[in-house]
Amino acid sequence: MSQEYTEDKEVTLKKLSNGRRLLEAVLIVVTILAAYLMVALVSFNPSDPSWSQTAWHEPIHNLGGSIGAWMADTLFSTFGVLAYAIPPIMVIFCWTAFRQRDASEYLDYFALSLRLIGTLALILTSCGLAALNIDDLYYFASGGVIGSLFSNAMLPWFNGVGATLTLLCIWVVGLTLFTGWSWLVIAEKIGAAVLGSLTFITNRSRREERYDDEDSYHDDDHADGRDITGQEKGVVSNKGVVSNNAVVGAGVAASSALAHGDDDVLFSAPSVTDSIVEHGSVVATGTETTDTKATDTNDEYDPLLSPLRATDYSVQDATSSPIADVAVEPVLNHDAAAIYGTTPVMTNTATPPLYSFELPEESLPIQTHAAPTERPEPKLGAWDMSPTPVSHSPFDFSAIQRPVGQLESRQPGSNQSGSHQIHSAQSSHISVGNTPYMNPGLDAQIDGLSTTSLTNKPVLASGTVAAATAAAAFMPAFTATSDSSSQIKQGIGPELPRPNPVRIPTRRELASFGIKLPSQRMAEQELRERDGDETQNPQMAASSYGTEITSDEDAALQQAILRKAFADQQSERYALSTLAEQSSITERSPAAEMPTTPSQVSDLEDEQALQEAELRQAFAAQQQHRYGATGDTDNAVDNIRSVDTSTAFTFSPIADLVDDSPREPLFTLSPYVDETDVDEPVQLEGKEESLLQDYPEQVPTYQPPVQQAHLGQSAPTQPSHTQSTYGQSTYGQSTYGQSTPAPVSQPVVTSASAISTSVTPTSIASLNTAPVSAAPVAPSPQPPAFSQPTAAMDSLIHPFLMRNDQPLQKPTTPLPTLDLLSSPPAEEEPVDMFALEQTARLVEARLGDYRVKAEVVGISPGPVITRFELDLAPGVKASRISNLSRDLARSLSAIAVRVVEVIPGKPYVGLELPNKHRQTVYLREVLDCAKFRENPSPLAIVLGKDIAGQPVVADLAKMPHLLVAGTTGSGKSVGVNAMILSILYKATPDDVRFIMIDPKMLELSVYEGIPHLLTGVVTDMKDAANALRWCVGEMERRYKLMSALGVRNLAGYNERVAQAEAMGRPIPDPFWKPSDSMDISPPMLVKLPYIVVMVDEFADLMMTVGKKVEELIARLAQKARAAGIHLVLATQRPSVDVITGLIKANIPTRIAFTVSSKIDSRTILDQGGAESLLGMGDMLYMAPNSSIPVRVHGAFVRDQEVHAVVNDWKARGRPQYIDSILSGGEEGEGGGLGLDSDEELDPLFDQAVNFVLEKRRASISGVQRQFRIGYNRAARIIEQMEAQQIVSTPGHNGNREVLAPPPHE
């Protein structure tokens, strides 16, 4: 038994391909890995070292070792209990991949994407279901991390049951997407398994009987299969016979097909051959020679290069019958098989047959010789050199056309043999036209259509005769061209029979003479109606064509005579010369104006007649006005162009479209009129229609006819009161056609829209009626509404360069409202504490990298930065972290990191990091805080918000002076504007006054005109020195008044004055002198406002004026606080030569924006930190009596807000300037640089002046060495020289120039 099995099943080793080897190797490795994972999962022990267990001091219990413990722990952590299912799934996938070794299916990416989606859904939902419904395994979640995530996300939305149902639904969908199984099939399989198991348990199966039944069923099926296979093979063989028979003939193919399926539609469809046989078109007998030649020739042709087979060109001699005797050429079908006398029969009989043109038997002609046998492939080379006729479509009708030479040499009575005629017709070209138009002037006895001259001739094949008959029925006898081109333009007009050759005029020429011709469409319709009669009796049809069209010609000639009479009447009536008419006729383009339908011809002729009549009227009026009598019109009727009949049969379609007659030059109207040609009128040429159509629509609709002179002659002008439409719509009145000649400098066409407007026949007629005036076109004056004043045209003043001094509406509120400022966003961005916690851990890690042990104990988020409070380990210095600021910024990927070594009230070190999303601090929200509203000081200013988001409000009266420094773009100017607006929102002009010094003329100039100013914004540095000198004098005056009243500051002074006014006894000025003014009584003391001196660019002021300003500022900084004068100095360059030690010592309050280096930061703050700011309003504010700067984020103010507040204050009142501020008067101590006016000169002054004038150098050290005096005395002498204009002020380098001339001069 085994021997027989071994012999039947020979075991052979089959080599695998390279890809199959690699696949099986991978599958083996994956299977082993699955087994290893299963062992590791089953033997998992929580005490083994793993991803979640770092400390380990015991032996490994897992059978897979440490690697197995790690992998099992990772799988349990990720998937939970479902980790046990991963190894079996891997084995199942390997087995599936192994079984599909021979499957080479097309990779469906859509199905693959669905499987991936199903896999993802199964994994996620399975983990979620396990997490919801299974207890935890060891210390892992039952669903792993994935299940815990899904369960925690779904439980707030659904309860436990709802989440379970939702996940089950998604699991079911995922299973369908992954496996592609329908749940109906799954249910059936489950039911079958259940029933099968129950049947097996109850032992009710009948396996023996069922197996016997199945064997009998299989035997029957095999028997039926053999029969069915035999039948199918028979059908196939029969189909092969059908295909072969179809090559030989269509009749045998039809019989073979009907033998197996009489009711099959595909086999019962009639073929082309059947259609021809049914209509009487049979294949002729006696053509065996031709058939033999065709068969032999076609054997050499490759059937792969053509859809036709070689046997398709054989003649079917089974169906032949005699046919009529008219010899013509055949018509080609799509396969070009009709030329060779056959009808192609396709191999597939289900293909519908092509259209065939059947004619009755009595109209079928006979050809004298057989058709030539050729290849059906397309012809190469010159198409006009081919000796065979060419056809384009089975729907086209072929017509034989004899050469012109034969037509002209033939006599009407001559008769040639039929074979010669057919041979000549074959050697010529066939003109194939889409419209079979019969020549009405052709005689029926011409041999081309004779049916009696070709009798008793041999017959042709059936397909050739059928096609030839269809062509002979509509064949014209001669061509309209004298060359050999096949593109013949037929059916254009009636070709009348004449005894001698004449040139037949075109339809356009006849229409110009008034002869209305029947259109080509009407002729085609008549031909279609007579199609049936024509095919039955061609000879009668030809005669009937001649008779009917002759009657149409009579009607056309009669209508032409009427039109000629009407034209003569019009010519005699208006005395128009025929020369203009002939020129108008010859100049018209026949291609553009050729009518296609009778309605179009009629409309066009009526329009032309109307235009010609109007032109005749205008021309007659001109001639009558010029000569006083009508011209000679005797020859107007007879001078009509005669028709040349010398070339009757030599015209072509190109000759109809091209007119070689001499033309007159086309007159074009120039858009500009030269001054030399102003008096020359315009002469109408023969092309009035094209000229007037090209003329723009500015021409008036109608004017009375005026005389028209020839070029070169001056014509008298007539005044025209008619206004043009263009002139009325544009300028209000028109000067077109006026009698006053003037040179024209503007073109006639003034706009493109005037040319592109639509032209209707009415407008064309109206344009034709309007003659062109001989007077030049003068430019129309513009109306005053569109003109501008001459002063505005000539002036260079621009609205943007003018101050808006218009009176504004006075506000009703005592102070500006906050509505003038931009509102902050309603919703604030929440603080992400989770991200801040992660950043805190990252900070600790980065500090640990630099061996600095610290712990983040507090986080203070702000609008721009966040402060992390670090608790350093014992023994760690804060300077170590300060030195690591740049390294921390790099490791934390931050722009800058600032270390705060001391936080007031806390034992921690601050680390300030910028936020990822920076917020904007709006001025309105800071001004709207309670801290600013409740501050009673009129000099309260807002700076912004601190790192905790709390508003920072300062009092300028307590500072008492402020020094601001920052580079370009740091927000320094915005901060200064915020300070000024804060004071404008807090104080009135009676409380605070400003002196603004703006060397750049940009930042503070916007405040020009507010009532708070004591003087205009100072932009000249000399005026700035005078303003500061006035401040010093005002300070001294206020100190005298306060000392007289016994008060300590300006607030006490104003209170004392207010009390006196309340008592009704105002205080007189104790220092008034009668010589000070013309008043009899001394003035009363009034309330004194605070004075704030704003200097925007202090460095430029120091460079321009020098030491003098430094001394003045130093004096103001030392003494001006009690007098109510406060300085705000802003600079971009906080260097030591600008902010000297004298100024820094007297200005304790400073604000540092972003600076460029630590040196500048130490210059302004006496410590570092300003170089690491973020810019855009980020500042360090050093409050008075404090050495620790506070980080503040400045309030943002837009220019629109500044202008709004300034305009609000401008509407409340005008400023009251004090002229003596900039005049440099000697009031108080401000006269001579702080010197008293009655101070005596130094005894050495004259000698020092002589010394300076001789040496031409003025220096304090030189005077000191020369006269051996102290530095202070020498400096005072030099200052006295400067006061008397002997020497100049010191320059930026401290040198002075000697202004007085030398002594010898």
UniProtKB/Swiss-Prot annotation:
Biased composition (Low complexity): 416-431
UniProt-annotated location(s): Cell inner membrane
Annotated Pfam families: FtsK_4TM, FtsK_alpha, FtsK_gamma, FtsK_SpoIIIE
Cytoplasmic side: 188-1305
Bias (Basic and acidic residues): 523-533
A cellular-component GO term for this protein: plasma membrane
Membrane topology (UniProt): Multi-pass membrane protein
Protein name stated in the entry: DNA translocase FtsK
Residue stretches of biased makeup (Polar residues): 535-549, 707-743
Organism annotation: Yersinia pestis
